[in-house]
Amino acid sequence: MAAASRARVAYLLRQLQRAACQCPTHSHTYSQAPGLSPSGKTTDYAFEMAVSNIRYGAGVTKEVGMDLQNMGAKNVCLMTDKNLSKLPPVQVAMDSLVKNGIPFTVYDNVRVEPTDASFMEAIEFAQKGAFDAYVAVGGGSTMDTCMAANLYASSPHSDFLDYVSAPIGKGKPVSVPLKPLIAVPTTSGTGSETTGVAIFDYEHLKVKIGIASRAIKPTLGLIDPLHTLHMPARVVANSGFDVLCHALESYTTLPYHLRSPCPSNPITRPAYQGSNPISDIWAIHALRIVAKYLKRAVRNPDDLEARSHMHLASAFAGIGFGNAGVHLCHGMSYPISGLVKTYKAKDYNVDHPLVPHGLSVVLTSPAVFTFTAQMFPERHLETAEILGADTRTARIQDAGLVLADTLRKFLFDLDVDDGLAAVGYSKADIPALVKGTLPQERVTKLAPRPQSEEDLAALFEASMKLY
């Protein structure tokens, strides 16, 4: 393009930005200088994209030994869980390490839906092992546990709560160098191979909380679609719901230039920064894949095409939400999982009650997006259309209802439990669920619409039944 043409394009873009509608209901412009939030705090003016290197391909796990050899690794920790330790993904990884002469030790005591206690057990193992590299083979629980182990083994004098997000922890920035970590995801949901977030149940308060820092993200993610063929149908579905909500929430988070406070130093800019032009691309692309392939992936265990696309969608959504963030569906999901009573999800071989993360997230989605659509309704309507809604005659003020109805149909078609009541909760549990949501300000403050305790209670009540 000639210089004159480039200058003309730049001029036109500036004019469009200056003329952009400033109404918060109809505008989502990113061309904002620092300003003030409603609380009076200075808002941010920049966003930063951080993502792990990723390698995709059927059978790519067999390269992990060569990668570690190239890194000069001499003492590797391979983390997984007891169920997966008996399955092909772990065996393929171990065979590659053996073939390439990499000494390694297996830690297979990862807990599905980890707790602070299970994190600390893995951390102690890592500290004693003095490992110079890590391999995490598993779902989000394994990858999150491995990230935490790597962090605290690299910072052995730190207190456990030092890096845990506020208000429960101190939320200190990570300034120590970590060891290389290669993530091999075996589910299509969390996107942890691309993010610097490790989530766990803090049992003392019965809430989920996390460690969030770009510094802890895996060095490399090996996305091998062959690993998806071992997943039972409900694991595929619940993992896919996590992808769905990652995409929807990151696309509808508060824009980065409206988030406060503005950091005084780049190291304190949070991993979750609000929606931005780059995260938007990944979120929308992931959502289109979910709309096209999730039902196929659930219904046909041999549909490698559908399961391969969902494996990529997990990473794509991870890149999006790993930088933009999520909001109410995830913030409210943590007490839903953490306060579980007796519910045990189908297809999960665990010895404790379990509401899988993806299920806990999606059960509130119709209520949440009805609530948030007052802000940026055009984005809510756009996502409803991607998921199959006919929006040609829809009114912009009905965007939340349209998206909620579209989600209900999508979930009904995939045999999702009929709301929180179906997984063991009642109206009597709402105060505890609200209390468990309040510490999740790391994500809830990114919701496009502020929420009171009364709002949260109403959202939980509306989520007791879906259909």
From Swiss-Prot:
Name of the top EC class for this enzyme: oxidoreductase
Family: Belongs to the iron-containing alcohol dehydrogenase family. Hydroxyacid-oxoacid transhydrogenase subfamily.
Gene: ADHFE1
Compartments where found: Mitochondrion
GO molecular function, one term: alcohol dehydrogenase (NAD+) activity
Keywords: Acetylation, Lipid metabolism, Mitochondrion, Oxidoreductase, Phosphoprotein, Transit peptide
UniProt EC number: 1.1.99.24
Superkingdom of origin: Eukaryota
Function: Catalyzes the cofactor-independent reversible oxidation of gamma-hydroxybutyrate (GHB) to succinic semialdehyde (SSA) coupled to reduction of 2-ketoglutarate (2-KG) to D-2-hydroxyglutarate (D-2-HG). L-3-hydroxybutyrate (L-3-OHB) is also a substrate for HOT when using 2-KG as hydrogen acceptor, resulting in the formation of D-2-HG.
Protein's name according to its UniProt entry: Hydroxyacid-oxoacid transhydrogenase, mitochondrial
Catalysed reactions, semicolon-separated: (S)-3-hydroxybutanoate + 2-oxoglutarate = (R)-2-hydroxyglutarate + acetoacetate; 4-hydroxybutanoate + 2-oxoglutarate = (R)-2-hydroxyglutarate + succinate semialdehyde
GO cellular component, one term: mitochondrion
GO biological process: glutamate catabolic process via 2-hydroxyglutarate; lipid metabolic process
Positions of modified residues (N6-acetyllysine): 445
Modification Phosphoserine occurs at: 452
UniProt xrefs under CDD domains: HOT
Organism expressing this protein natively: Pongo abelii
Gene3D superfamilies: 3.40.50.1970, Dehydroquinate synthase-like - alpha domain (1.20.1090.10)
